[in-house]
């Protein structure tokens, strides 16, 4: 608020700030002179020399000559740097009767803005002869008039001034009169006829004389008027005015017919000799704005006055009686100025558009004038307060419109500025001129992304050149400064092959996958994109793009256990005494996909005898479904289907061989040599087999040592766990050491591998060694069902 008041105050007093604001304006005015009526194109001066500038500086700085009222009396030649006359000058038209005719002007330079004051004096030549208002004048003079009597005559008018103006009057040779040349207060010369010798009507009733007006030119010019003198009979008294000089003041806007003043004269004679009539000694009957009532002496306005053209009138009023005698007085009418002229604004220099980022740019240079006078002529310039512009006075009623500070095109690209010029008259008159200033763009805004980071989702196995998303940036600038180009920035991870993964359309920010993505190889990656405008210098910004690869069900389940090796199938041993729900084994499988594509379910697809075994759907455990009997076949082949939850689902099968035994103790089940894995077998499977064999061998040795020390009943023991035996008849070396026909003890080891395990580590629990009674039968020998499930593989 305070800042606005200060700015407003500055603008109000702007008119009264003097030339101190512009140090570069010269304090002395350069003066030139030229004779009037000189031909157009005549050399006046060389500006480069007179202004003390370098050669070529005037042309490079756009020199121009500015006169008041926007008239171009002179022209500047940019080639020679000379000032030349632009037109013939008529001093009388330009300055009227003013003797000293001086036309002020300014030389305006740009970059930086600079003013030089100068003036052109138009010198008078003797191109006008004196002229009388009438070719003939009539005088009536009584024969008894005494010598020395003075008779005023109508004056001649010469448009020239100084020595070329009217200088003197002469009269043709005669014995009765001579002429005197008198000076008025304002400098004009008028003639007076002086009687030298008495007249005699009877001898010569009339005379004709020639009045000659001469100027001071070389050679002199002259004008003539005939004087006809009638000699009258005796009339003793001459009309006499109450005052020798009357003065009146008339506002220029007085209506026609209004009374200016009333003059009055008396004549002491009687009868017709005492009757007075009034008349004006008029220089120009056509242009004279006054008229007089011949009877009353009232002088009234018959034509409109204009103070700006003529400020005062000098009139001679004549009073004539009936006998022909006359008296004379002078009337000075001063025209009073009325504020009837609005100020004028002349634009000399205007720039649009202007750059937005530079302070105090000169937008316009203009001059103001008012044809009135006094307070009516004083003016104040102003613009709206809410605009970032200032008015600064320079010289001779010149103003500059400058920016107050740097503009911002993005906030406002155009300003409509109304310049108001108001005079100080009553009532105040004003003139307004509107200009439109365009603000040109400068690249001062970097592109801005709509988001600081983008997250894109791409399903794996996509087709190359797939459009995976877009980034977008906008620039508040305009034109070429707002044209945005997109690019990929170097990745922060040097191992990320970004150039082979994605590309970006430089024009619209569309992102494309260059090749098919594999979720199992690359789940996500991120990179930065840049947006650069085309300004100078170019500005840029960047945004982060995260690409998340969505899993597709492109991997089938893989069975880790039992190993699916055609040359060495896995055989599980199950005692016939097993209860329903007895854990036979567990199918362990993994899926390379993720999410629901990796959710596995298990089901029994085929079995030698349906209803004997079942598979738990969620964990792949194979358990007995009922009690076993002697009638059940000893060998069983199970096919377990492992299926994921993808769409469409993928599956794999695992084949199990189950051998039903009546009972066993210290069996020796040699491990067959595994067939060499095919070249394309998974490396993880190889590691699992090697680790399993190593751990099993170590564990077997420990069990043998433990049994030999504690029981001392066996000389040799074999570990039966997750054993692999070839299909076919039960090995002959597995014998019943107790002679009961069954195995008295069962050493079972369960290896479980969970689907989430990726460490290839195996964990083993201690073997289950049930305590059998010495004389127990097969029925009395119970095996804990959970023992098969107490040996997890993770």
From Swiss-Prot:
Positions annotated as glycosylated: 46, 183, 416, 565
Keywords from the named record: Calcium, Cell adhesion, Cell membrane, Disulfide bond, Glycoprotein, Membrane, Metal-binding, Repeat, Signal, Transmembrane, Transmembrane helix
Record's compositionally biased regions (Polar residues): 784-794
Cytoplasmic side: 710-794
Topology versus the membrane: Single-pass type I membrane protein
Domain Cadherin, residue spans: 34-132, 137-241, 246-345, 350-449, 454-559, 566-669
GO CC, alphabetical: plasma membrane
Keyword Ion transport among UniProt keywords: no
GO molecular function: calcium ion binding; identical protein binding
Reported function: Calcium-dependent cell-adhesion protein involved in cells self-recognition and non-self discrimination. Thereby, it is involved in the establishment and maintenance of specific neuronal connections in the brain.
Known partners and oligomeric status: Forms homodimers in trans (molecules expressed by two different cells). Forms promiscuous heterodimers in cis (at the plasma membrane of the same cell) with other protocadherins.
Record-given protein name: Protocadherin beta-6
Species whose genome carries this gene: Pan troglodytes (Chimpanzee)
Phylogenetic placement of the source organism: Eukaryota, Metazoa, Chordata, Craniata, Vertebrata
